[in-house]
Design a protein with these regions (language model features):
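Noncatalytic luminal/extracellular "stalk/propeptide" segments of secretory-pathway proteins
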Residues: 23-26, 32, 52, 56-168
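Metal-dependent peptidase/peptidase-like ectodomains
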Residues: 111-113, 133, 223-226, 233-234, ...
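N-terminal capping segment at the start of a domain
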Residues: 25, 29-65, 91, 208-213, ...
Length: 387
C-alpha cells in the first residue's frame, strides 16, 4: 500500500477511535466502518492527485510569496469542494527572499580552489557583494561558545557539528543540532566573526545542502549565515585535518534579504459536531514550505493526510458528535506565526479542544503517533489501543 494513503487510513482509524471510545453504538459497527474507510481510500482516493497539484502546480510556498497565497486559495477551495465549512484566519508572517545570487568557494594557501554547494539560511542577511574571510572550524556549537574573540575576530566561522547517528529517533538527532542552525551566527558575531557557515542538518553524506530557519539576537551585528552540504563539510574538515598550518579562505556571495511582515492566513475547515459542537478535535499540518523544493514531505504529505481523512469522512456521510476541525497552518518553517496566532485565538475565544493531531514527519510508511501531554492523558490515549 502506498504511504500517503496508508497514513491517511491510520489517521482516520485513530481519529474515529477518539469518538468511538464514547459511542457504544459506533463500537458495535466499528469493524464495518473501518473497512468502508479502507475501501473508499484504496479505490477512490484523491490523495496523490491533490499532493501532485500542491507540489507541481503551486510548488515551493515560503511565507510571504505568491505561491503561499496560491496554496491558501487552493486549500480553501479544496475544503469547500469536499463539503467542509471554511474560513480564513488572518496572521502576520515574515517575508524573506533568497534572491538570485548564491555562491560559495573555498581557497587554500596551497592553491586549492573548490566550489562548495550551499544555501543561505532562512532569515539571513545578504553579503552585500562578495564576502571573503579566513575560515576557522569548530567541531560543535559548544566549542564555538568556548572560543575567545581573538580566535574568531574578522573570520568566517564554520561549525561542523554532525547529527548523532546513534539516535534511533532521528528527530532527537535533529533536535540536538537545531540550536546550531538557529543560533551560531549571532554567537559568532558576538565574538567578531564576519560570516557563519554550518554543516547541513542531515545524517547522510551527500551533495544536497539543507536550508532552514536562523535567528539573530537583538543588539548583535547581523552577519551572513549559510549551510554547506554534508559532503563538502567533510571535504573542508579534511583540508583542516591534513594541513593544519595552511590558511583556508571562504568566499561567499548571497543577495537574500528580508522585507516587512506580510499578511497571510491559516485555512480552517470544519464538520460541526451533532452533540458536542463546542468541543473540538483539531487535525492539521503546515501549508508553507521552504523555497528550494516542492515541500512534498515537509509538509505537503501532512496536509494531504489530513485533507484526505476529512474528505473520506464526508464521502461516507459520517456525522461526528464532536466538531472536527481541519487546519492548514501557515509559517511553521520560519516563525510558527500560524500556530502561535491560532493558539492565542483559541485561548481568547475560550474554545475547548478535546484533542489535537498533527502530521509533520514526512510521507513515509506510518509507524504510529507521538504524544505530548500529562501522564494521565498519555495513559488515556494508550487505553484506546485495543479499539
Amino acid at each position: 500500500m502506498n504511504t500517503t494513503k496508508s497514513f491517511s487510513l491510520l489517521l482516520l482509524v485513530f481519529f474515529c477511535s477518539l469518538v468511538s471510545a464514547q459511542d457504544k453504538e459506533m463500537k458495535t459497527n466499528s469493524a464495518k466502518f473501518i473497512r468502508d474507510i479502507y475501501t473508499e481510500a484504496l479505490t477512490r482516493g484523491h490523495a496523490y492527485e491533490d499532493l501532485r497539484f500542491l507540489c507541481k502546480e503551486i510548488g515551493a510556498r515560503i511565507t510571504g510569496s505568491t505561491e503561499a497565497q496560491m496554496a491558501i486559495e487552493w486549500g480553501q477551495e479544496k475544503m469547500k469542494s469536499y463539503g467542509l465549512e471554511t474560513r480564513l484566519h488572518e496572521i502576520q508572517v515574515p517575508h524573506w527572499e533568497r534572491g538570485t545570487k548564491e555562491a560559495f568557494y573555498l581557497k587554500t594557501s596551497r592553491g586549492t580552489h573548490l566550489k562548495l554547494r550551499g544555501l543561505a539560511l532562512g532569515g539571513s542577511v545578504g553579503t552585500n557583494g562578495t564576502l571573503r574571510g579566513n575560515l576557522i572550524e569548530f567541531e560543535s556549537l559548544e566549542a564555538l561558545k568556548e572560543a575567545t574573540p581573538e580566535m574568531v575576530k574578522g573570520k568566517i566561522v564554520f561549525v561542523n557539528q554532525a547529527m548523532d547517528a546513534k539516535q534511533i529517533q532521528t528527530f532527537k538527532a535533529y533536535g540536538g543540532c537545531y540550536p546550531l542552525r538557529g543560533n551560531s551566527a549571532s554567537i559568532a558575531a558576538e565574538k567578531g566573526a564576519i560570516g557563519s557557515v554550518i554543516r547541513s542538518l542531515g545524517l547522510a553524506s551527500d551533495p544536497h545542502p539543507h536550508t532552514g530557519s536562523m535567528y539573530y539576537t537583538d543588539g548583535v551585528d547581523k552577519i551572513p549565515a549559510a549551510a554547506i552540504c554534508t559532503a563538502d563539510a567533510d571535504k573542508i574538515h579534511g583540508f583542516f585535518k591534513n594541513n593544519p598550518q595552511q590558511e583556508i579562505q571562504l568566499v561567499m556571495e548571497m543577495d537574500c534579504r528580508s522585507f516587512p511582515d506580510a499578511t497571510s492566513y491559516n485555512v480552517l475547515g470544519e464538520i460541526k459536531g451533532s452533540k458536542y459542537s463546542d468541543e473540538i478535535i483539531t487535525v492539521g499540518g503546515h501549508l508553507d514550505s521552504w523555497d528550494t523544493g516542492e515541500g512534498a514531505h515537509d509538509d505537503g504529505a501532512g496536509i494531504i493526510h489530513c485533507l484526505e481523512a476529512f474528505r473520506i469522512l464526508k464521502e461516507m456521510n459520517y456525522q461526528p458528535q464532536h466538531t472536527l476541525r481541519l487546519v492548514f497552518f501557515m509559517n511553521e518553517e520560519n516563525g510558527n506565526k500560524g500556530g502561535k496566532t491560532y493558539a492565542k485565538w483559541v485561548k481568547e475565544n475560550e474554545e475547548k479542544h478535546f484533542a489535537a493531531i498533527e502530521s509533520d514527519r514526512g510521507g513515509f510508511a506510518p509507524r504510529g503517533f507521538t504524544c505530548d501531554g500529562s501522564e494521565e492523558q498519555v495513559e488515556w490515549l494508550n487505553s484506546l489501543a485495543p479499539i
